[in-house]
Amino acid sequence: MDTTQVTLIHKILAAADERNLPLWIGGGWAIDARLGRVTRKHDDIDLTFPGERRGELEAIVEMLGGRVMEELDYGFLAEIGDELLDCEPAWWADEAYEIAEAPQGSCPEAAEGVIAGRPVRCNSWEAIIWDYFYYADEVPPVDWPTKHIESYRLACTSLGAEKVEVLRAAFRSRYAA
């Protein structure tokens, strides 16, 4: 287990809790949180935050000795020490925060995962799979690193083949050329 990243995740979430700032773990760490175990080494920590409260997340990053490094079309990259944070906003949509363009329910209010004994909010299985569909549009799956192939397999197995195919059809119909 990568205790450096686990410790940092716990520090970030504790600081967010002090501010009543909901954060969701995304990407590979969300898969691990939902499974309740670390499945692989992670290159970064994906975080989803309320878009209108971005300044509060930036303040947490700075308080922990980090900085925002780069603006992206979907959010920003930050670093704390040697650890990379990939941060994406979610926006309030009637009754819950949602990631733009992701399936409804992308940011559950409840803590649906666990990282090293700490309950955490994490992106939904559907949002995780949706990200893999975007990735497959950019990089053919035959060219994916083994870690991404395995993480995708774990996510698909957890969600179920039928639900994955329904999502894939929705993704294709939304983004058909």
UniProtKB/Swiss-Prot annotation:
Changing D44A: 4-fold reduction in tobramycin modification. Its EC number is 2.7.7.46. Residues 1-92 are annotated as: N-terminal domain. Its cofactor is Mg(2+). InterPro entries: Aminoglyc_AdlTrfase. It is an enzyme of class 2 (transferase). Pfam families: Aminoglyc_resit. Binds 2 Mg(2+). Mg(2+) 1 binds at D44, D46. One of its GO terms (molecular function) is metal ion binding. The active site is at D86 (proton acceptor). It catalyses: nucleoside triphosphate + gentamicin = diphosphate + 2''-nucleotidylgentamicin. Mg(2+) 2 binds at D44, D46, D86. Residues 93-177 are annotated as: C-terminal domain. One of its GO terms (biological process) is response to antibiotic. Monomer. Mediates bacterial resistance to kanamycin, gentamicin, dibekacin, sisomicin and tobramycin by adenylating the 2''-hydroxyl group of these antibiotics. This is 2''-aminoglycoside nucleotidyltransferase. It comes from Klebsiella pneumoniae. The lineage of its organism: Bacteria, Pseudomonadati, Pseudomonadota, Gammaproteobacteria, Enterobacterales.
